[in-house]
Regions:
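A generic local structural motif
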Residues: 12-16, 55, 78-80, 113-115, ...
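A broad, low-specificity signal for short, low-complexity segments enriched in glycine/proline
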Residues: 8, 54-55, 88-90, 121, ...
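Generic enzyme active-site microenvironment
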Residues: 29, 93, 160-162
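Subtilisin-like serine protease catalytic core
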Residues: 16-27, 34-46, 55-106, 122-125
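Short, well-ordered amphipathic alpha-helical segments that serve as non-catalytic structural scaffolds
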Residues: 8-10, 74, 111-112
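Substrate-binding/access-modulating region of protease and related hydrolase catalytic domains
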Residues: 97-167
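Autoinhibitory propeptides
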Residues: 1-16
């Protein structure tokens, strides 16, 4: 673990030393939503709520805001000690998960479809989808979800997904 931390530290130092900050990059985050946070001020450039249809940004779970911070937090609230991987990137937030962090695959698919609709207008280049499922029997919805993820790839977007929390 110590070696892993050291490698991550060196990688982060390399990106900052080479001024890889995410400036000019818009990342769509499909998650539980997003709230205004000091580390994200002025960089939330879009919003869509596929769960409840609210027009104002919110995160009733906190996970989406956390993910956005890992991605693009500028570290101001932590006096620069903790910043995201791309501290100048912009966030296009899409709420696809409910207050408990769960959701319906159709909401995720609707979120993906919305990102594809807005990709050119908002200049979205990266899509983060932090969802996971437990192993289960084959479900037709899984195939539909994969179809739409492949549409993201076909559109030239970089897609980042969660590896899971269960090992």
């Amino acid at each position: 673990m110590k070696d892993l931390k050291r490698k991550i530290h060196y990688w982060c130092s390399d990106t900052m030393r080479n001024k890889i900050t995410g400036k000019g990059v818009v990342c769509a985050v499909l998650d539980t939503g997003i709230t205004q946070h000091p580390d994200l001020v002025g960089r939330i450039v879009g919003w869509k709520d596929c769960v409840q249809g609210k027009k104002t940004i919110y995160d009733d779970n906190g996970h989406g805001t956390h993910v956005a911070g890992i991605l693009a937090g500028n570290g101001k609230s932590g006096r620069g000690l903790y910043s995201g991987m791309a501290p100048e990137a912009q966030i296009f937030a899409v709420k696809v998960l409910n207050q408990r962090g769960g959701g319906k695959i159709r909401d995720v698919i609707n979120g993906i479809r919305y990102v594809l609709l807005k990709q050119k207008e908002m200049k979205i280049r990266i899509v983060n989808i932090s969802i996971g499922t437990l192993p289960h029997k084959k479900d037709p919805e899984d195939e539909l979800f994969l179809f739409w993820v492949e549409r993201l790839w076909d559109a030239g977007l970089v897609v980042v997904t969660a590896a899971g929390n269960k090992g």
